[in-house]
Amino acid sequence: EVEFVIATNPGQPHKPLAKIASGGELSRVSLAIQVVAAGHSKIPTLVFDEVDVGIGGSTADIVGLLLKQLGDRGQVISVTHQPQVAAHAHHHYRASKVIEGNSAESLMVALDRQQRVDELARMLGGAQVTDQTLSHASELLSLASN
């Protein structure tokens, strides 16, 4: 039996992960373990569902970079609402739901570069996409591609 203990903030004592971690923290600890383990094992596909919940900015950028590094070794499928994470993806799909009457259909659409810029701008700016959000999205994608 193994019990992980962590301190989620500086100056706090280590406590059992299962008792103190939020869903987002559990996801990020899982990501950290996968990054370390990836150098020693070959897992063909990893799936992360909102591993970036509760973070933003530079932390989201780091999570995106780590997912990209994992994707260099195998397939990574990640659901995200963070443009900083999505910008690092090798491939970007937009998921949406169409409701007609009493039924719903989920759609997945592969995005080309311009569609990625448009989607990142939507993620950054919401319903009102402006020239400024489009410029920011394009820059975000270019920086993540380097």
Q: Where are the model-predicted features located?
A:
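C-terminal lobe/lid and adjacent interdomain/linker elements of RecA-like ASCE P-loop ATPase modules
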Residues: 2, 58-146
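GG-anchored amphipathic helix commonly corresponding to the ABC/SMC/Rad50 NBD signature/C-loop
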Residues: 3-4, 8-11, 26-46
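Generic beta-strand/beta-sheet core signal
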Residues: 7, 54-56, 79
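Short pre-catalytic strand/loop immediately N-terminal to key active-site residues, enriched for Gly-Thr
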Residues: 14-20
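Conserved D-loop-proximal element of ABC-family nucleotide-binding domains
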Residues: 15, 40-41, 53-61
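ATP phosphate-binding glycine-rich loop and adjacent ATP-lid/helix-beta elements
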Residues: 21-22, 26, 119
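Conserved helix-loop functional segments at active or binding sites
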Residues: 35-39, 57, 69
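Walker B catalytic acidic pair
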Residues: 49-50
